[in-house]
Amino acid sequence: KKFLLIENQNKSDLIEIHNRPIYLNYLTKELSNRNYILYFHNDPLSMNGSASINDRIFLLKNCYRIVFNSNWSKKRFLEGMSSDAINSEKLIVIHQSAAKNKVDIKKKQKIITFVGKLNRSKGYDLFGKAVLKILKKYSEWKVFVAGDEPRDKIYFNHKRLIKLGFIKHAGIIDLYKKTSIAVVCSRWEEPFGRTSLEASANGCAVIISNRGGLPETLTNGVILKKLNVKEIYERIEKL
């Protein structure tokens, strides 16, 4: 209501909505003479206001543009839609970006890194089992883990597996600068995957699962053919 009061005074030419497609149902009734741009940062089929085909037809009709963070997200939006929707110029993809920092590859350390929630959805259970085997075989390597997830309670212990807990973004970038191998082995369908993008931008060799928009984050990464401990271990060892 407060936004409507402000907007009735401002009379904006364009209104951006991020990740809340359900808001269009209300706004188009009260502010019908506006141009709307809707940004999807997550799976459209998992959100109120875009889960059904009728929801998405409504959005396509009432939005000036609909922006997706990956081709995968756009494909999800178009599931079950007509050819008119598929060919609509209203639908565009804008990938996220990351600063490509100057990194001296010679100064990279023998470090394998995992960044994210330490749960099954992110594949941390698979990663942990794989890197314990690596640490056992290669005594000069270390593993750094940044993140937490008290609900899943997945623990791996080794003197060269360093758990950093939650750290701020600047700390993550500093970690990537000295990391040689970064692993993003998610089970769930990542709408995009900023973690792998930033790892690559900071000179890491990156291993990813073939889930959601993750393959769109890299040009020269390693994509796991199978998402299991053996495959992760073998890809790390090869690198």
Outline where the language-model segments fall.
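Conserved donor-binding/catalytic core segment of Leloir-type glycosyltransferases
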Residues: V67, D104-K122, G128-L132
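Short beta-strand->alpha-helix junction loop in the catalytic core
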Residues: D43-P44, W72-S73, L91-V103, P150
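Nucleotide-activated donor-binding/catalytic signature segment of Leloir-type glycosyltransferases, i.e.
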Residues: D152-I173
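A short, active-site helix/loop in glycosyltransferases that binds the activated sugar's phosphate group
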Residues: Y26, G49, R56, K61-S88
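Short His-centered aromatic/hydrophobic patch
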Residues: I17-I22, F40
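Acidic donor-binding loop of glycosyltransferase active sites
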Residues: K177-P191, C204
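Short acidic/histidine- and often glycine-rich active-site loop of Leloir-type glycosyltransferases
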Residues: I154, R211-L224
